[in-house]
Amino acid sequence: MSGSTGERSFADIITSIRYWVIHSITIPSLFIAGWLFVSTGLAYDVFGSPRPNEYFTESRQGIPLITGRFDSLEQLNEFSRSF
């Protein structure tokens, strides 16, 4: 049998009151913080994603789909000019 490292076992940790006091606060807090991050629209600003009403503008109603293999750079430039 191998030697002990002196650390507490996992079963000992998850059955302790201290573990559940700490995690009963932090887990719901992380969930609420994530929900607020997404619901307020801050996630769109931080990651630069377009909001749902900004995907298609009045001038650009089609999907920016690259169809040519050899002229893909020109198509990308055309799509970027339409923004």
Swiss-Prot record:
Query: InterPro entries recorded for this chain?
Result: PSII_cyt_b559_asu, PSII_cyt_b559_asu_sf, PSII_cyt_b559_CS, PSII_cyt_b559_N, PSII_cytb559_asu_lum
GO CC annotation: chloroplast thylakoid membrane; photosystem II reaction center
Q: Which residues cross the membrane?
A: 21-35
Tell me a GO biological process for this protein.
Answer: photosynthetic electron transport chain
Keyword field contains Iron: yes
Keyword flag Oxidoreductase = no
Question: Pfam families recorded for this chain?
Answer: Cytochrom_B559 (PF00283), Cytochrom_B559a (PF00284)
In the record, what terms sit under GO molecular function? electron transfer activity; heme binding; iron ion binding
Instruction: Please explain the role this protein plays, according to its UniProt record.
Output: This b-type cytochrome is tightly associated with the reaction center of photosystem II (PSII). PSII is a light-driven water:plastoquinone oxidoreductase that uses light energy to abstract electrons from H(2)O, generating O(2) and a proton gradient subsequently used for ATP formation. It consists of a core antenna complex that captures photons, and an electron transfer chain that converts photonic excitation into a charge separation.
Task: State the family named in the UniProt similarity comment for this chain.
Answer: Belongs to the PsbE/PsbF family.
Name the record gives this protein: Cytochrome b559 subunit alpha
Question: Per the UniProt entry, what species is this protein from, by scientific name?
Answer: Citrus sinensis (Sweet orange)
For this protein's source organism, the top of the classification is: Eukaryota, Viridiplantae, Streptophyta, Embryophyta, Tracheophyta
